[in-house]
């Protein structure tokens, strides 16, 4: 049986987790991203080529490494698709090696609007958010009302849940 290695950060910032994971990836069969969003990035330099990743685990740049995005990650579909496209343009077979949990909560435009509006309304107590909707998406996840990746495969359910969410959040944006 293989062993599992877990890299945890406790500083909520640029601690070098990505670099450590990248160092360990040569010996890994899989790399799993279990939480977070596209607000942070990690830069990898492999064979002199620089790549910046925000959502996709760094193992994607290593042959034969499966990459998994777990349900604790909040996913901005537009950011994910941009990252996939950039990697595929470099010849990385992303679609063959990336698996995404259908339970991942989606970051939608209203999450971004809420995040930015809240930060703008704070006079002195700004928290320094990236304004990418991460916090509001996690609020929906914890409250069990968020749209998830799996909802994209059921258009009727997606439409009903989206309508409910827009009604819930629109009052805060008016």
UniProtKB/Swiss-Prot annotation:
InterPro entries, sorted: Adenylosuccin_syn_GTP-bd, Adenylosuccin_syn_Lys_AS, Adenylosuccinate_synth_dom1, Adenylosuccinate_synth_dom2, Adenylosuccinate_synthetase, P-loop_NTPase
EC number: 6.3.4.4
PROSITE patterns noted in UniProt: ADENYLOSUCCIN_SYN_1, ADENYLOSUCCIN_SYN_2
Matching PANTHER family: ADENYLOSUCCINATE SYNTHETASE
Function: Plays an important role in the de novo pathway of purine nucleotide biosynthesis. Catalyzes the first committed step in the biosynthesis of AMP from IMP.
Subunit structure: Homodimer.
Name of the featured protein: Adenylosuccinate synthetase
Source taxonomy: Bacteria, Pseudomonadati, Pseudomonadota, Gammaproteobacteria, Pseudomonadales
Encoding gene (name): purA
